[in-house]
Amino acid sequence: MRGGCAIYGDARVLNQSEILAVQGLTHEHAQILQIYDRATVNHSRIVHQVQLYGNATITHAFIEHRAEVFDFALIEGNKDNNVWICDCAKVYGHARVIAGTEEDAIPTLRYSSQVAEHALIEGNCVLKHHVLVGGHAEVRGGPILLDDRVLIEGQACIQGEILIEYQVEISGRATVIAFDGNTIHLRGPKVINGEDRITRTPLVGSL
């Protein structure tokens, strides 16, 4: 454990987890790294000005910059792949972010992406600018890339090799599934909802 940080309450840092607090690398110059309430950190590396609190559970993860994990969120990497959360990304509610065991099955949350409520992110998934996955939505890579104002909620299911970008909303029970060998590209503005089922890249103007 190095640098100025605050670990208090019933928080636990276990199993060779590494805490490296560094201030001044983000816009919040004075913010210090904090782990508190009942947050638990296992086999993980927590760096810079991260905030972990509530009942969050973090295992085999690399979390850095000003990222936050709180409420009952579960971050679960494994010995083969960790979970990477950085920049200003947030995971909260009862959301789960889980690494797979196959090669590159590393969930990556960057920039302002958020995973909330009861959402699940699993495997090779990258979330970037202004992405929110909430409700009971499931996103299983992949690889999957979500970028530039993407909202996935309800009971939506996204699975396979998929790129979704620029003002796309997916909700209800909608599914976007790329089967073996296929890649789906959805570029907005688009709204996909109800029972919509997409298994290939739509023709221009068909959605």
PLM region descriptions:
Residues 5, 11, 17, 23, ...:
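Residues at the loop-to-beta-strand transition
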